[in-house]
Amino acid sequence: IQNDTGLPEESICSFRFLWRSTSVDDAVQIHWANGNIQVIRPVRGISINGEAQGGIRPPYWVILAFCRSADGRIICSEGYAHALYQLTCPVPVDSKLERNTLTALLNVASWLKRKPGTPELSLERPLFDTEVYVNGEKKYVLPDFIVTARAPDGKTARVVIETMGYEDSDYCARKSRQHTGMKQIGELHTDPPKWLDNDHPPFKKHMYGVFMHLRY
C-alpha cells in the first residue's frame, strides 16, 4: 500500500481506501484474502463519529486517506470511522440505540414476510439532508431511517423513523422542530413510541401494528 504504486516519484498521488473493520483505535488492521494482516497507523490519527474513545461501538466503516509525503513515500495521512449495523448488513448507524431500532425494524419485516397479504418493506438510511417545505418555508431535515411499504396491489407509503436519545428540554425542542419537517416526507414514528412517556409499547410491536394498518 505504501510505495508500490507504479507511479513516477515526482507525480502527485492521493487516494481513499474504504472497507469494514471489527476493531479501530489509533491504528486499524486489514485482513487480506491471502491471510496476511497489515496494521496501518495514520499520521494524523483516526477520528470516529460520535466517540471520544476509540473502538467502543464496532464494527465500523473505515476510510483511510493516502498521499505522497515530502520524501516521496506513499503514506496514510488520516482516517475516519463510522459505526455500522453489522458486517453482513453494513448500514451506517450513529449509536447503539439506532442499532436497536434497526434490529426491531428487521424483525418486523421478517414477521410481515411470513404473513400473506402484508406489505413488503424496503429501508433507506439517509446520509444527506432532505429539502422540505413547512408553511411555505424551505427547511432541511435528516431522518434516521425511511421505510417504504409496498402493498400487494403496488401502492406505496413512506414511514419516517426517528431514534430518540435524550429527554432534556433543548433536545426535545430541537427534535420537535425537525419532526414537523420530517412529516412532509412520510408518516413519522419514534423509537420509543410516545418517547417522553414511560408507559409505551415495545417499538417492534408498535411498528408491526403500524405496517399492518398503514394507509396508502
Swiss-Prot record:
Name the family: Belongs to the channel forming colicin family.
What is the protein name for this chain? Uncharacterized protein in cib 5'region
In the record, biological process GO terms are:
defense response to bacterium; killing of cells of another organism
Q: Report the superkingdom from the record.
A: Bacteria
Q: Which controlled-vocabulary keywords does the entry list?
A: Antibiotic, Antimicrobial, Bacteriocin, Plasmid
